[in-house]
Amino acid sequence: MTTMSRSFGRSDLANGAHRDVAVWLLACCFMVAVMVLLGGLTRLTHSGLSMVEWEPIRGIIPPLNDTDWQLFFEKYKQTPEYIKVNAGMSLAEFKGIFWLEYIHRVWGRLIGVVFGLPFLWLALSGRIGRAMVPRLAGVFLLGAAQGGMGWFMVKSGLVDNPAVSHYRLTAHLALAFLIHGWMFWLALDILADHRSTRRRAHGDVGAVRSWMLGLTGLVIVTLLFGGLVAGLKAGLIYNTWPLMDGAIVPKDLFPEGFHSLFEDIKTVQFGHRTLAEITIVVALVGWFRTRARLGTQTPAAIHAVGLMALLQVGLGIGTLVMVVPVWLASAHQMGAMALLTLCLWALHDLGRRI
């Protein structure tokens, strides 16, 4: 059992509440995954700058009549995106981009309610112990920060250049993955404590867990570079694989030194591609070696990670060579979340076998 798992203790969840709390956390994980999907669709359909104000309470109410719609549309007409990109857009076209951004924002508020109210009830009713309260409170605070980060990102696209900061977009994405991953890990801890068992396996489990820890780190860095690629629209160029600009290592990388790794479109795409290629090699080699070491005792989570890594690299290559179709790019983004989630599952499971 992992150190984090042990820290909860059987007293942290009273009266048989283990499974209920775990199911609630997993439901919140699912809602965050849907939120990430909606956010990706909002970005890919260029809908994210259609709402130019952030009103956490009043913003729940959408335009209800023609007057309301005209008011929202007139505000949008003052933005750089309308002036430089969408000049002449009709009200009907504006409604098309508005609704997706609106749903994205309201879904975020709904997550806050679905997480916050049960958390208060669980804490006040004593159904969770003191050790868990600060952990769940931390998740709630991260969720609140995520709302602010979302608006901080949108604001960057409402001044001069009609595109959000790729740094802020990546931070917004990273926070979503952090919230999702933290809740998932807590749910696994609760379920492991409920079962109250430790499974013994082959002595090589420690080495396998070290490999999985390294792979998880690679997945995280790769998905962060994926956020930079998305923010810079770097997937719209050099749409070939395995060659990039006619070479394995293209010319003119790092034109401005180290900063190019985060700001030059060509270098950023190369970084993401290279990290993805390293990740799939590490995943497959580790998967095969684990099967050789542990045989039939290989955890199901390890097999799931290997298969998902294969699928994810296929989704990434397809997204690139097909020049970022919305449906495939969305699948690739969700594949990243699925792969990270499976890595966390594998890490947790391996920790209980040591």
UniProtKB/Swiss-Prot annotation:
A single cellular component GO annotation: plasma membrane
Summary of subunit composition and partner proteins: Interacts with CtaB.
Keywords: Cell membrane, Heme biosynthesis, Iron, Membrane, Metal-binding, Oxidoreductase, Transmembrane, Transmembrane helix
Main location: membrane
GO terms of biological process kind: heme A biosynthetic process
Highest taxon, organism lineage: Bacteria
Chain coiled-coil ranges: none
Name under which the protein is recorded: Heme A synthase
Transmembrane segments: 21-41, 106-126, 139-159, 171-191, 212-232, 268-288, 304-324, 326-346
Extent of the signal sequence: none
Subcellular location: Cell membrane
Natural source organism: Paramagnetospirillum magneticum (strain ATCC 700264 / AMB-1)
Cofactor(s) for this UniProt protein: heme b
Catalytic reaction(s) noted: Fe(II)-heme o + 2 A + H2O = Fe(II)-heme a + 2 AH2
GO molecular function: metal ion binding; oxidoreductase activity, acting on NAD(P)H, heme protein as acceptor
Record membrane topology: Multi-pass membrane protein
Pathway linked to the protein: Porphyrin-containing compound metabolism; heme A biosynthesis; heme A from heme O: step 1/1
Binding site for heme: H272, H332
HAMAP family: HemeA_synth_type2 (MF_01665)
Top-tier EC class: oxidoreductase
Annotated InterPro entries: COX15/CtaA_fam, HemeA_Synthase_type2
Pfam families (UniProt xref): COX15-CtaA
